[in-house]
């Protein structure tokens, strides 16, 4: 059979980063927090993620937050403020702006099916 070669360091970093993002995106919104947990520099983390995935380290955090926000907006009746809080946004205006920046639509409009 074919022997699988050990993952190279780039893939390892990407894997570890992805797992950390899925675990911590609600409280860690900044790449620096992940780099610090992984004991590597921000530039090293960013360039490695870019090479391994053709997306940026920041994009992966944003995608995790937006995916969760969209699911909550569609599946729960919790107030938007609470959804924002659950995702680490203390300020509902900031959550609204973040959501709209990355989706082109407000959380309220998204919830009302205007996508």
Q: Whereabouts are the PLM-identified features?
A:
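Inter-domain helical "communication" segments and dimerization helices
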Residues: 1-40, 44, 112-115
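Basic, amphipathic alpha-helical hairpins
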Residues: 1-3, 17-30, 49, 53, ...
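Terminal helix-turn-helix DNA-binding modules in bacterial transcription factors
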Residues: 51-93, 112-115
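Short hydrophobic/aromatic patch on the recognition helix
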Residues: 45, 94-95, 99
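Charge-rich, low-complexity intrinsically disordered segments
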Residues: 28-62, 67
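…primarily DNA-binding HTH/wHTH and HhH modules…
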Residues: 97-115
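Core residues of bacterial helix-turn-helix
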Residues: 38, 87-88, 99
